[in-house]
């Protein structure tokens, strides 16, 4: 269910704002989005896994908080990120 180190490095490389950037809001949202999509796939076969469902809700909430912060800080970066990730908003 977790993402591999290679996939995480790839996400960091594509969404980083600088050379050594691993903690910007864009990178964190991209990693959370990947984890959320992995869990969503997991629930297609394991419908009664309520323990993991709680974790999914926490991840979604954390991503929402980061997106809200980014939207307040820099609207252009926010719009660019949601277009890149294909999020609804």
From Swiss-Prot:
The UniProt keywords, alphabetically, are: Ribonucleoprotein, Ribosomal protein, RNA-binding, rRNA-binding
Top-rank taxon:
Bacteria
Q: Which GO terms describe its molecular function?
A: rRNA binding; structural constituent of ribosome
Q: Which Gene3D superfamilies match?
A: 6.10.250.3130, S15/NS1, RNA-binding
- What biological-process GO terms show up in the record? translation
The family database entries (SMART domains) matched by this protein are listed as: Ribosomal_S15
Report the GO terms under cellular component: cytosolic small ribosomal subunit
- For the region Disordered, what residue ranges are annotated? 1-24
Quote the InterPro entries the UniProt record gives: Ribosomal_uS15, Ribosomal_uS15_bac-type, uS15_NS1_RNA-bd_sf
* Basic and acidic residues bias: start-end ranges: 1-20
- Per its UniProt record, what Pfam families does this chain match? Ribosomal_S15
Q: How does it assemble?
A: Part of the 30S ribosomal subunit. Forms a bridge to the 50S subunit in the 70S ribosome, contacting the 23S rRNA.
Q: What does this protein do?
A: One of the primary rRNA binding proteins, it binds directly to 16S rRNA where it helps nucleate assembly of the platform of the 30S subunit by binding and bridging several RNA helices of the 16S rRNA. Forms an intersubunit bridge (bridge B4) with the 23S rRNA of the 50S subunit in the ribosome.
Q: Which HAMAP family match?
A: Ribosomal_uS15_B
Q: What is this protein called?
A: Small ribosomal subunit protein uS15
Originating organism: Phenylobacterium zucineum (strain HLK1)
Q: Quote the gene name from the UniProt entry.
A: rpsO
